Amino acid sequence: TRFAAPELATTKSTMLSALTSMTTPAWAFATSSTSFPTAQAPVNTPLRLRILWNAKASAKAEAQALPALEGPLQLCLSKTPLPAQDPLLSHKTTHRPWYQDAAALLEKHPQLFDVIFLDTQSRVCEGSRSNIYIQDEQGHWWTPPAQGWLLPGVQRQALLNSGLARETELFLDDLLHARAIRVSNALRGWQNALLVQNPV
C-alpha cells in the first residue's frame, strides 16, 4: 500500500503532517470501499496489486501481471546519494524524487532488478524497490538499520523477527566484499542477488 501525495500537499511538512495524522490503515479503507480492478492476464498468473490511499481517505487500486524473475537478481549502484535523514524516506509514498533516475535506468535496462543507494557517508541504505542484505564470512545476514534513511519493508521486518537477518551499519566496502547479497520486498520475497557494473 502506497500513500498518494494529496494534490494540495506541496511541501514535505504538509505531507508528513498528513501521514502522521492517519489513524486508520490504508487496507481498512481499501477492503471496505474500493472496487478492485480485473487485470488482463491468463488464469493462475501472479498479479501485483497496488493500492493508493490519500489523506482524504480515498483509495484507488491497480492490478497488473507480475512477471517471473530469473535469479540471481542483478543490482547496480546509484550515482546519486540519498538525502541525509529525509523523513519521507521511511514512508511509502508517491513522493519519490530521489528514485526518478533509478526508475528510468531500470526501464531502459530490464535485466537489472534494482538500483542500490548509498548516503553521503557511503553507508548502504536500500534499493529503489527493495531492502538489501549482505552475508558475512560466518554466514550471518545483515541489513542496514531503519534510522530515517530507508523504508522498513514488510518482508525485511519478517526476516528480522525470525532472526534470519540482523541490523547493522553497512558501508560500500562491506557490499563490495560481501560473501553473498540478497534483496527483499513483499512482492518477491527474499532473493539472491549480485552487484554488476553500471550500464553505460
PLM feature segments, named:
Residues T1-A4, A26-R48, L52-V200:
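Helix-start/capping segments and mature chain N-termini
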Residues F3-T11:
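Extreme N-terminal basic, low-complexity initiation segments
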Residues T10-P25, T31-S35:
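Intrinsically disordered, low-complexity segments enriched in small polar residues
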